[in-house]
Amino acid sequence: MSGRNAFVGAAALTAAPAQKIARGLSVVTVAQLTEFDEIVDVRSEGEFAEDHVPGALSCPVLSNEERARVGTLYKQVSPFEAKKVGAALISANIARHLQERFHDRPRDWRPLVYCWRGGSRSGALAQVLHQVGWHVGQLEGGYRAYRRQVLADLVVLPTRFQWRAVCGLTGAGKSRLLRALEACGGQVLDLEALAAHRGSVLGSLPDLPQPSQKMFESLVWNALRQFSPSRPVYVEAESKKIGVLRVPDALVAAMWASPCVVIEAPVRARVALLKAEYEHFITDPAALTAKLECLSGLYGRAVIEKWRALIDAARWDELTEDLLIRHYDPAYTRSTLKHYPSLSRAPRLRLAAATDAEFTRLAQQCLA
C-alpha cells in the first residue's frame, strides 16, 4: 500500500511545517505521512513484525542478528567499537537496498524514513537517499512517536463516527453482509479481517496467525482514518476480544452504544454458510476435534463424545446444527442482549438465499 493516497489524514492530527535539515531533507511528524509516496521502515525484521506503519516497506539497516551483535559490543566492549562495526553493517545494507529495492524509483519519488526513535538508523538511510537526489522525510521521534499517536487517536477517533452494529446469530452471514456493504460503497470496519480471526472458539484461520496487539491497533487506526464522519460506519457486533486480541476500549464503547441492524437466516441456511466458511475443519477433522475439547468444561464428556462421533461419521450438517442450538445461539444471544441495548429496536434483514445477489440486495436496503 504505497502512494500519496495510502493514508487519509485523521481529523485528530494537525500537520506542522516540516523542519528542514537541508534542501530536500526534512524532519516531519506523523501528521505528514500523507505527503510522501512511500514509508520506509529501517528497523530490524523483528521490530517490523511486531508493529509498523501500515503499508510501510521493510528495509532493515541492521538485521535482528546484526542489531544484537552491535548491542553486545556496545555493552561488553565499548560504544566506539559498536559504532564502528554498526556503521560498516549499515553501509553495506543501505548499498544493498539501493541496488535491490530503490533502483527503479523515479527522480520525483518522495520517501519517508523511520526507525525506533528517529535517530541514527533512519538518519543514515535518509542522508544517502537525499544525496542521490530524492526529497526525503525523516519521522521525528520515529516509531515511538508514531505509536504514541496511534494510542491517542484510538481514544478519540471512534467517538467521531456514526456506528451501525451488524448483529445476527452465528452463520447468518454478518461477514458476507459487511463485504456487500463495502462493495456497494458503504463504510465498513471489518475487525475480524484485521484480527485474522472469526471471533469464536473455532474462529482461528488456518495457516494465518493473528497479528500482535500493537499491529492490530495500527490496522484499526489506519482503517478509522479513512472514514468520513458524515456517513455511517458498519461494524460487526463484537465483544471486547477477537481471539487473543483486545478491541480498543473507546471503539468497544462506541459499538455497544450504537444502533443495530440484525440479519436473520433459517438454521439450514446458516449450516450451509458455516460449512462453506469453515471448510478447513471438514478437510482436517482432527483439528476440529481438538478445538471442541475446549468446551468440555461447559458441556461435559458425553456431549464432547457425541460431537466426536458426528465428526468421525462426517455428519457435518447434524454436527453444525447441534453446535448452533446448544452452544453458539445461547452464547451469542446472551452477549448481544447484554452489550447492545438497542438490539430490541433494530430493523431486521431476512436472508432469502445465501447468494451474492441476495447479500447485495440487503446491503442496498441498509444503505438506502
Which role fits each region the language model picked out?
Residues 134-148, 190-195:
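A short glycine-rich beta-strand->turn/loop micro-motif centered on a GG-aromatic cluster
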Residues 120-121, 162-182:
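Glycine-rich phosphate-binding P-loop
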Residues 126-129, 175-187:
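A conserved segment at the C-terminal end of the G1
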Residues 254-260, 264-368:
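Conserved NTP phosphate-binding and transfer environment spanning the P-loop NTPase/kinase superfamily
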Residues 1-54, 82, 151-158, 163-167:
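Flexible, polar/low-complexity N-terminal or interdomain linker segments that lie immediately upstream
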Residues 184-254:
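Conserved nucleotide-sensing/catalytic segment adjacent to the nucleotide-binding pocket
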Residues 33-106:
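Positively charged, proline/Ser/Thr-rich regional signature most characteristic
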Residues 85-140:
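Catalytic cysteine-centered active loop of the rhodanese-like fold, especially the PTP/DSP P-loop
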